[in-house]
């Protein structure tokens, strides 16, 4: 069994804890969404039980990603600092039942397995933490940058001379 594949219920029952770091390039679904796939995500997974004695996993993911601003189309750094609580259910029916009992949007219920891939959970968490439409707080002025690069600024009235 891979070091990143766990028996989710046993991991929770034993209150185990694992942590690590993974290069963003190893997370293909995430890398496809980024301006640059450099960087590393740090993660911590802790097993346990919630107040109703259901098996639970707590996943924390931190790191910095390079994403593209949807306004100016330039890359910028986005910090991820996300933590999720995942309650484990034996099957879909039990997951629906537990979800209805908890009535808490901050807690997700998933179907646990004996072969749960930690890295897939980390990648899912990072994807969910990204903004739907990423934007700078204040975009850099790219028009001034382009004018400097070209060296010559065209007059806004230049096209009027062709109207004669």
Where are these regions (language model features)?
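Secretory pathway export signals and precursors
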Residues: 65-68, 135
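Mature extracytoplasmic or otherwise solvent-exposed domains
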Residues: 33-40, 64, 71-90
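Alpha-helical protein-protein interaction elements
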Residues: 35, 68, 149-152
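A positional/architectural concept
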Residues: 1-66
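Charge-rich, low-complexity linker and terminal segments
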Residues: 1-15, 77-164
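Short cysteine clusters
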Residues: 69-72, 139
């Amino acid at each position: 069994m891979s070091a990143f594949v766990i028996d989710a219920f046993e991991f929770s029952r034993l209150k185990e804890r694992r942590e690590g770091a993974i290069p963003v390039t190893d997370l293909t679904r995430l890398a496809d969404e980024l301006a640059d796939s450099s960087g590393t995500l740090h993660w911590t997974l802790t097993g346990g039980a919630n107040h109703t004695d259901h098996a639970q996993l707590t996943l924390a993911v931190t790191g910095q990603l390079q994403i593209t601003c949807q306004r100016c189309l330039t890359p910028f750094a986005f910090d991820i600092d996300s933590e999720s609580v995942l309650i484990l259910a034996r099957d879909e029916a039990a997951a629906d039942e537990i979800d209805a009992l908890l009535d808490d949007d901050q807690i997700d219920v998933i179907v646990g397995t004996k072969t749960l891939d930690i890295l897939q959970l980390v990648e899912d968490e990072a994807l969910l933490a990204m903004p739907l439409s990423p934007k700078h707080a204040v975009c850099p002025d790219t028009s001034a940058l382009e004018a400097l690069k070209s060296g010559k600024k065209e007059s806004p009235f230049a096209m009027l001379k062709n109207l004669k």
